[in-house]
């Protein structure tokens, strides 16, 4: 089976935690690689963002990234990308025509890609599944200071995708409810496929590994360390963590507390690193906070291992892959009781869930684990068992089962008028 994956606005080659690259990048790359291991062939079409990028990049046996030229390489924000939908679609069609390619199924990611896939599905006369990752109707319910509302045009485009895709793939049952409440949808056409973690790469560390990770970061071995990994946008709540940390430092004057924030700026609003550094300075905790640039997975392992607990004070998360990665390394997670985080964290066993983003409530939850070694250690021991339920291999198997359950398209249809790759 040959799959055309569409990821217009962000490439699986980009470093997660920077710009618009995040969990979706991790999701696409890992699922594509696992699908290939199951015998499928996957081409991932994305927009070229650098002039020296090769048109085709091999990710491994059976997986390619196709960099399609659509507009200038640099200088376009995600909000401006809808102006390049036609150009991107044309590049996809030109590539497939030039190389005589055909596919059995299209899997699009995010609403921009869904608009492209909608046209390609009719041109190629093949099945189309779509994973939204985020939804305008949900994001607009969780705006933070300085954030812009998602435009009505996006919500309209998402409704068109919901109406026309053969199957809409979501991460959790909670997301099924989001689609049903925010859009006119047919539940029978929504499938739940849970994401995963690279449980071979993210593994529990030994006591020595933790010591080495802390020494490399210049953190005292006796410190209580709170980790944060993700894009620095207010939706992710790094400001909430800093405010909670200030309360903890005042509450536990004899406890050496340190905060590690690993990630880069993204999105709109007051999320730039400088703003967070200024906030730490205003709170009087700048000496206890370290800001780290985004790191590849093999280096993220040591960040998780250096932490006693990982905090995810997000206003909303469709799932929260960081929670799985942290737990896979044996680090408990404190997360907001919202969206997919309610499934990603086993409350009371691998971590704690907090209602909302009140800094005092977050200080209480974090303080509970930092001050109770027995509870924290018990959660650290259980966390990898919980994360092991969510491997990328299992995700890929669910996807293959879904792909193969779809009936083939009738022979007479759009493909009769528009062969694959033709724009006639």
Curated annotation (Swiss-Prot):
Q: Does the keyword Magnesium apply?
A: yes
Q: Which domain of life is it from?
A: Bacteria
Q: Tell me which InterPro entries the record gives.
A: Glyco_trans_1, Glyco_trans_4-like_N, Mycothiol_biosynthesis_MshA
Q: Which GO terms describe its biological process?
A: mycothiol biosynthetic process
Binding residues annotated for 1D-myo-inositol 3-phosphate, in chain numbering? 9, 20-25, 78, 110, 134, 154
The UniProt keyword set, sorted, is: Glycosyltransferase, Magnesium, Metal-binding, Transferase
Reactions that this protein is recorded to catalyse: 1D-myo-inositol 3-phosphate + UDP-N-acetyl-alpha-D-glucosamine = 1D-myo-inositol 2-acetamido-2-deoxy-alpha-D-glucopyranoside 3-phosphate + UDP + H(+)
Q: Which GO terms describe its molecular function?
A: acetylglucosaminyltransferase activity; D-inositol-3-phosphate glycosyltransferase activity; magnesium ion binding
Main EC class of this protein? transferase
Purpose: Catalyzes the transfer of a N-acetyl-glucosamine moiety to 1D-myo-inositol 3-phosphate to produce 1D-myo-inositol 2-acetamido-2-deoxy-glucopyranoside 3-phosphate in the mycothiol biosynthesis pathway.
Q: Which family does it belong to?
A: Belongs to the glycosyltransferase group 1 family. MshA subfamily.
Fill in the subunit field for this protein: Homodimer.
* Name of the protein described by the UniProt record: D-inositol 3-phosphate glycosyltransferase
Upper classification of the source organism reads: Bacteria, Bacillati, Actinomycetota, Actinomycetes, Mycobacteriales
Could you tell me the gene encoding this protein?
mshA
